[in-house]
Amino acid sequence: MTKSELIEKLATRQSQLSAKEVEGAIKEMLEQMATTLESGDRIEIRGFGSFSLHYRAPRTGRNPKTGSSVELEGKYVPHFKPGKELRERVDAVNV
């Protein structure tokens, strides 16, 4: 599901809100989440999951085109850990 699809689905389900209002709310929510992670804080949405930063240590990688070694710096990357309710719902899916 893309952001546009999410906006459309929420606007359809919440008929009292316009698509523009839903779009604004989603953009603001995502902006607040990004700002929180930028400041190094953790985000927890009970039942859904948590977002945090994990440190990736410096390492030697490879350039896929040339095969040559490349030194990669250490960095923080966003990490999502699903909550219990979300894990249980996904586990129950028979694909």
From Swiss-Prot:
A Gene Ontology BP annotation from the UniProt entry: regulation of DNA-templated transcription
Quaternary data: Heterodimer of an alpha and a beta chain.
Lineage: Bacteria, Pseudomonadati, Pseudomonadota, Gammaproteobacteria, Alteromonadales
Keywords: DNA recombination, DNA-binding, Transcription, Transcription regulation, Translation regulation
Family statement: Belongs to the bacterial histone-like protein family.
UniProt KW Metal-binding keyword: no
Record InterPro entries: Hist_DNA-bd, Histone-like_DNA-bd_CS, IHF-like_DNA-bd_dom_sf, IHF_beta
Descriptive protein name: Integration host factor subunit beta
Organism whose genome encodes this protein: Shewanella oneidensis (strain ATCC 700550 / JCM 31522 / CIP 106686 / LMG 19005 / NCIMB 14063 / MR-1)
One GO CC term, this protein: chromosome
GO molecular function, one term: structural constituent of chromatin
Pfam family, one: Bac_DNA_binding
CDD domains: IHF_B
Function per UniProt: This protein is one of the two subunits of integration host factor, a specific DNA-binding protein that functions in genetic recombination as well as in transcriptional and translational control.
